[in-house]
Amino acid sequence: MNSEGSSEGSSEGSNGVDPRLKTGATELFGVDYPIVQTGMGWVAGPSLVTATAKAGALGILAAATMTLEEMRAAIAEVRSRTDRPFGVNLRTDAADVEQRVDHLIAENVRVASFAQAPRPDMVAKLKDNGVVVMPTVGARRHAEKVAEWGVDAVLCQGSEGGGHTGTVPTSLLLPQVLDAVDVPVIAAGGFHDGRGLAAALAWGADGIAMGTRFLLTSDSRVPDWVKAVYLDTAVTGTVVSTAVDGAPQRVIRTEVIDTLERTGILKLPRAALNALRFRKLTETSLRDLLREGLSMKKNQDLTWSQVAMAANAAMLTRATMVEGRLEVGILPTGQCVGVVDDLPSCEELVSRIVSQARARLDTCA
């Protein structure tokens, strides 16, 4: 074991947790460690969230890719497995978002996270009922806006992050957000070990959030052969592409992504053909495709070209992450995928990160 696995010289509180790792976020979330497992669509199900919660971190359920009934069942399953706090990720543009919010309140879910900023009235409703509100931000101005609306914390994701992401790296974005708001800030984008946690705390953040690193655990339900592709991907093996749904998204470079990059989605007929081709691959019904597309068009400022692919993007990811159909080729990932080389359990991962962080903090004291 290298020096980062040691924690000699550091003190612990009465509950065995290093007080240097107790932050505004750990108090707000009710967890032992300032580590968050993000609500990755089709990945962060009850098993992963439960394992994360039992390890002392905050697991977030990916309800944004679930139906209302699936979300209710998933929350019940997590509740049956652990009494530790956890969170649920919601889509603000979902037609039934109000019902989802009501269910989170009824079930006393600790945290509601959002990829897009929730409306001010939704923030107020959740807060008034004891639910912590934490949206993701990719720019200082976004953080300032949601802070004015009263959110409890923000998850600040730099361009190293997976899935939909911005253009500013964490090292530049995080200090800006920290200077802009007075609520706890969770740093995301490129984090995968205890050195990153120690660095984030040194910056002034209240913790770190990780997606890809938790995807690559033995508790993740992603098929083993899909995990193998992730483990074989180099640091240079990812690309930020707008070819999937019109918005910048970091994915593993595959033949399908390369084809989409060459084809583009600049013209509706071509985009429609791509969407229909992928609909056949993913066996998505035309009705579901149209319903998803019209919902996105109504709630987001998308062109019809973007709608044509965006409507099917979630199904492309599902076919890969759930069914293991690599021929679809949509593999969202953070840039840290190139330096991850094992599949620990969530308990092993969190313990390792905590030990490494304590060791780094010792050397910086």
Regions found by a protein language model. Name each.
Residues M1-E4, E12-P184:
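Active-site entrance/lid segments in N-terminal catalytic domains of soluble metabolic enzymes
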Residues G41, A188-G194:
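Gly/Ser-rich catalytic serine loop of serine hydrolases
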Residues N2, T170-D182, H192-A365:
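Conserved active-site-proximal phosphate/metal-binding subdomains
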